[in-house]
Curated annotation (Swiss-Prot):
Keywords tagged on the record: Nucleus, Ubl conjugation pathway
BTB domain location: 200-267
Function: Component of a cullin-RING-based BCR (BTB-CUL3-RBX1) E3 ubiquitin-protein ligase complex that mediates the ubiquitination and subsequent proteasomal degradation of target proteins, but with relatively low efficiency.
Family: Belongs to the Tdpoz family.
GO terms under biological process: negative regulation of protein ubiquitination; proteasome-mediated ubiquitin-dependent protein catabolic process; protein ubiquitination; regulation of proteolysis
Protein name stated in the entry: Speckle-type POZ protein-like B
GO molecular function: ubiquitin protein ligase binding
Subunit structure: Homodimer. Heterodimer with SPOP. Component of cullin-RING-based BCR (BTB-CUL3-RBX1) E3 ubiquitin-protein ligase complexes containing homodimeric SPOPL or the heterodimer formed by SPOP and SPOPL.
Pathways per UniProt: Protein modification; protein ubiquitination
Domain MATH, chain residue ranges per copy: 31-161
A Gene Ontology cellular-component term: cytoplasm
SMART domains registered for this protein in UniProt: BTB (SM00225), MATH (SM00061)
Amino acid sequence: MSRVPTPPPPGEMTSGPVAESWCYTQVKVVKFSYMWTINNFSFCREEMGEVVRSSTFSSGPNDKMKWCLRVNPKGLDDESKDYLSLYLLLVSCPKSEVRAKFKFSLLNAKREETKAMESQRAYRFVQGKDWGFKKFIRRDFLLDEANGLLPDDKLTLFCEVSVVQDSVNISGQSNTNMLKVPECQLSDDLGNLWEGSRFTDCSLFVGGQEFKAHKSILAARSPVFNAMFEHKMEESKKNRVDISDVEPDVFREMMVFIYTGKAPNLEKMADNLLAAADKYALERLKVLCEEALCNSLSVENVADVLILADLHSAEQLKAQAIDFINRCSVLRQLGCKDGKNWNSNHAADIMETAGWKAMIQSHPHLVAEAFRALASAQCTPFGLPRKRLKQS
């Protein structure tokens, strides 16, 4: 009787490439176990290489494949004379060969499995062939009563065998009406809505330029816009918002982020975009700007970045800027030469920049913060990557 092909499980058809035909190969594995107790173990033959064998066993009464366990109480050879050796032996088999994996363990006084060892692959057995472990367990550890492995002088071995049987191929054709769910295009669709200025209901005027937008989207994305339109403010009544402190190109980039969650030109305007993100409470955009500024910190700009971070409560960026200054200062004190990322002269260079000198006059509290942090800093290894900023 021929096997009727069955389709792949539904869970495997929901994603990825789709083929017109398919095949499943099922490798059949028969698993069974065997327990062997050796009474009066201490009276077993004490000569190296001598063998004690179990009775034969199989997976069931109708299985003609017979196995047994083989123990060398005092090891198999000189290399293993201080160990107990344990092997699985194929006694008889109707096939020319068979592949099997196995696992051995001991049962302690509480009948718990312990000292387990298992094969890392399926070994090839032929009749009369054995596989196992020459150094299964040290004899001194086994004979130590404190370890509880020989209660009443009984050694109990537990063996689990997994025998590879035949392989079965199941093949068939895919249904022609199989559904493929398209990828989500929400970001692209909203981006097209913004770019096309379709169905807009408000206008935003920035630097003499008009940007048409959708109040519902602005309100959903920005708590500041939400407050404008929710309460009966002038902007809500006239559907007009005048913005005077953001440059048009920066505002456009912010709007692209509001609609799509992306800011393709962020690297070019991270400082101004951070200010806009802070003003309109766009937390994720703000942290993305912080990350970009952290990655571009230098001797020339660190003071300006520190002022910017303080002005807009960008705490992660502020901490990274102070850390940059302090690393340079500590390296200079330690007399370090040029390293992979740091130069001992950077600290002096920072203090010579126009940004640092301006900060002393306009933001002296930031200078004080930097030196307080330096005073409490621990001397840890330098040159490590900065921590990635947490994004909201």
